[in-house]
Amino acid sequence: MQQFAVFGHPIKHSQSPRIHRLFAQQTGIALSYEAMLAPLDDFPAFAMAFFQQGGRGANVTTPFKEQAWQMADVLTPRARLAGAVNTLHWQNARLLGDNTDGVGLVSDLHRLAMIGDASRVLLLGAGGAARGVILPLLEQGCRIALANRTHARAQALAAAFQAQGAIEALPYDALGTHTFDLIINATASGLQGELPPLPRSIIRPDCACYDMFYRAGATPFLAWVQQQGAVRLADGFGMLVAQAAHAFSLWHGIMPQIAPVLIQLRQEPVG
């Protein structure tokens, strides 16, 4: 039986084993998929031991995505630009690194009809979560504005993708003069209740709001935008299932159906 895993710290909350087992049932593929608590001080050795002992592939979550990027022998173009890897594939004694976060996000945005050609997108945050989704958004023709508490970080990130499409960095206090079709929160600090200093005026009924993170009930970001009048909003659970589907496809050569798994998981408690 092929062995797969997800590496993280913490990891007990991960939905990935459940998702991949449902994909396996759907496609008739026999596999083992486990959540593995990786040590903070020696992730590369831990990961390589898994592959040398027969592991075929692994998902990588916080805080190891940058280390996974560094240890990959081969990177896909989207992973190279993202500077982070969330999917590892052991092939012919070489480690391939990919990043399916961005394509997972775009897939979910299409499912929700939140994105279109030339959508004006405000992306909140300039860390790894934001960086991993910029290229797929630009490839959709989106025009991206980056906002971050440390404006210099947003400027540096925008500069890194300048050749790939329309992207700029805007300070929070300048956002009030702009209108957006979609606002995406890519700041994990929101889960602790820390909200970005957004001007209320940019939250309009026709502006969709998406939080890349999820938890049981509304995230603080989604609760806040709803209070400001937003009516089209979604959390990142659909993105999680979609990025997992693309990782599954990389490993097994077959794209599973996302919708049935998402429906089933939505009926189960979210950790």
Curated annotation (Swiss-Prot):
Record-level GO cellular component terms: cytosol
Residues engaged in binding shikimate: S14, Q15, S16, T61, N86, D101, Y214
EC number from the UniProt entry: 1.1.1.25
Pathway(s): Metabolic intermediate biosynthesis; chorismate biosynthesis; chorismate from D-erythrose 4-phosphate and phosphoenolpyruvate: step 4/7
Catalytic site positions: K65
Gene Ontology molecular functions: NADP binding; shikimate 3-dehydrogenase (NADP+) activity
EC main group: oxidoreductase
Keyword line: Amino-acid biosynthesis, Aromatic amino acid biosynthesis, NADP, Oxidoreductase
Superkingdom to which the source organism belongs: Bacteria
Catalytic reaction(s) noted: shikimate + NADP(+) = 3-dehydroshikimate + NADPH + H(+)
Residues binding NADP(+), per UniProt: G125, A126, G127, G128, A129, N148, R149, T150, H151, A152, R153, M212, G236
GO biological process, one term: aromatic amino acid family biosynthetic process
Family statement: Belongs to the shikimate dehydrogenase family.
Quaternary organization: Homodimer.
NCBIfam families referenced in this protein's UniProt entry, alphabetically: aroE (TIGR00507), PRK00258.1-2 (NF001310)
Function description: Involved in the biosynthesis of the chorismate, which leads to the biosynthesis of aromatic amino acids. Catalyzes the reversible NADPH linked reduction of 3-dehydroshikimate (DHSA) to yield shikimate (SA).
Protein known as: Shikimate dehydrogenase (NADP(+))
Organism for this UniProt entry: Edwardsiella ictaluri (strain 93-146)
Phylogenetic classification of the source organism: Bacteria, Pseudomonadati, Pseudomonadota, Gammaproteobacteria, Enterobacterales
Encoding gene per record: aroE
